[in-house]
A protein has these predicted regions:
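Active-site glycine-rich loop that binds ribose-phosphate moieties when present
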Residues: 122, 128-139
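Conserved AdoMet/S-adenosylmethionine-binding subsite of the radical SAM
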Residues: 134-142, 155-321
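Single conserved hydrophobic/aromatic residue that forms the stacking wall/gate
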Residues: 324-335
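Flexible, acidic/Gly-rich N-terminal and inter-domain linker regions that tether
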Residues: 1-84
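Conserved aromatic-histidine-acidic binding/catalytic patches
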Residues: 4-12, 80, 125, 156-160, ...
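Canonical Radical SAM [4Fe-4S] cluster-binding loop centered on the CxxxCxxC motif
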Residues: 82-127, 200
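Catalytic micro-motifs at enzyme active sites that drive phosphoryl/nucleotidyl and oxygen chemistry
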Residues: 76-80, 91-95, 137-140, 187-188
Length: 336
């Protein structure tokens, strides 16, 4: 409580759903909850450095009218992040700029520090100007010759209300259709890359799986049908399960519903110290794979002094990879 009090005095937000807090062992005797406990409760180093945290990735530093470190000229504002030729991140001006919980190792902690991302839900509701801005952001994807993959995140993509999320997905679908029709008029050798994959980044399947209601599933199903007709081939919910403790009956039902809409679920494991203990991630992969979740990415904690307490050396990540049998279907495809 001392650390939380100190964090509050520094203006550092703390947010977790009652559902997720209920997964913690408050007795300290029933089971080992360190993986999820260290994910939402802050270390002394994080609290101490809050206020001076900077973007870990130089590409995430955006100045109006100037290319970022990767050489991409981006629209004004902080809605689009881009590091690679074929993919860009879209952060909507909606409640998607909040999360179901603030992860202690969050890659966008500097955005919470600047309050571009926050938990003041009323202030995050989309304003009338958002629809106009969304059209302008879609123009960026439509007019780019290389982009074929859009990752809608935040914050958390599923924090947006169903109506708002539907509007965003419909805008993406219209953009993909226009880009495809424009390509039909272009000669060979001058055609643009068409949208192939749409991803929604969300940790709500773990933080608040009840968010995956029937209306959301129908929105996902309808979008998949419409977007498939204009050439989109992959539909992915990209999530973070850290521990088998998170795979509750509610989470299993959320996974089942998403898969029933024809979307793929992929898991990015954030390789914290607690998650890196031998045997822990193996069990997590077994559980998720049995439910149809693809465990494809092990994410090394980035940052500086603020994440010292949860950083796992990359050598441990490589050791984990080497211990997984080649024939094992749970083997992650990437380590970053």
């Amino acid at each position: 409580m001392y650390l939380l009090s100190k964090a509050r005095k520094k203006g550092m937000p703390f947010f977790a759903t009652p559902y997720y807090l209920s997964l913690l062992d408050i007795t300290g005797k029933a089971y080992d909850d360190e993986t999820i406990r260290s994910y939402i409760l802050y270390s002394p180093q994080l609290v101490e450095t809050y206020g001076s945290i900077r973007a870990w990735e130089k590409e995430d530093v955006v100045e109006a009218g100037k290319p970022n470190a990767a050489g991409w000229l981006l629209p004004d504002g902080h809605n689009i992040h881009r590091r690679y030729p074929e993919v860009a991140i879209l952060i909507p001006d909606t409640m998607g700029r909040a999360c179901g919980g603030l992860c202690a190792s969050c890659q966008r902690m500097y955005d919470f520090q600047s309050e571009r991302l926050n938990f003041e839900f009323e202030t995050l509701r989309p304003k009338e100007s958002w629809d106009h801005k969304l059209r302008r952001l879609m123009n960026y994807f439509e007019e780019d010759t290389q982009l074929r993959d859009i990752l809608i995140t935040g914050g958390d993509a599923l924090m947006s209300q169903n109506k708002t999320l539907r509007n965003i997905l419909e805008a993406v679908c219209r953009m993909a259709g226009r880009k495809r029709r424009a390509n039909a008029r272009r000669p060979d050798g001058e055609k643009y890359a068409e949208l192939q994959r749409v991803r929604l980044g969300s940790r709500l399947p773990a933080y608040l799986p009840m968010r995956v209601n029937d209306e959301l599933v129908e929105i996902l199903r309808e979008f998949r049908e419409k977007a498939s007709a204009v050439g989109v081939k992959q539909f992915v919910i990209q999530t973070h399960f850290q521990s088998p403790l998170e795979v509750t009956p509610e989470a299993r039902e959320a996974i089942r519903k998403i898969l029933s809409a024809g979307w793929l679920i992929t898991n990015q494991l954030v390789y914290t110290v607690a998650a890196s203990r031998r045997g822990h991630t193996t069990r997590l992969r077994q559980v998720l794979n049995s439910l149809g979740v693809v465990c494809y990415y092990t994410f090394s904690v980035k940052g500086f002094q603020e994440n010292y307490a949860v950083f796992t050396p990359n050598s441990r990540s490589m050791q984990e990879l080497s211990l997984i049998h080649i024939s094992e279907p749970t083997r992650p495809l990437y380590i970053s």
